[in-house]
Regions:
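A short, structured beta-strand/loop element
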Residues: 17-58
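Short, charged/polar N-terminal "headpieces" of proteins
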Residues: 1-24
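Alpha-helical structural elements
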Residues: 10-12, 47, 74
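Context-gated lysine
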Residues: 3, 29, 37-39, 59, ...
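Well-ordered alpha/beta subsegment
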Residues: 52-85
């Protein structure tokens, strides 16, 4: 379970699953509260997919969207290196 390295958001765990499927995405979890998938090569409407638990706050979703926008190229490079090995 390789960690997303190009950015960090306090209190969130961000990672890739090795040998995961397209489209490029990573998982984000707030321990004991929720987990979502963040699709970073897709349009905004399809960016977040709830996995379990409560819905993340608007503030958290905005932080993730900003991080993805800033680090999209690095996320794609990490996806290729860690997932499509």
């Amino acid at each position: 379970m390789p960690k997303v390295e190009c950015f960090e958001i306090p209190s969130l765990h961000c990672w890739f699953w090795s040998n995961d499927h397209d489209p490029p995405h990573f998982h984000v979890k707030r321990e004991g509260e929720w987990e979502i998938k963040v699709k970073f090569a897709e349009g905004e409407e399809e960016m977040f997919e709830q996995q379990w638990g409560d819905t993340p706050s608007g503030k958290v979703l905005r932080q993730l969207k900003k991080a993805v926008t800033r680090h999209r190229a690095a996320l794609l490079a990490e996806w290729e290196a860690k997932v499509n090995q």
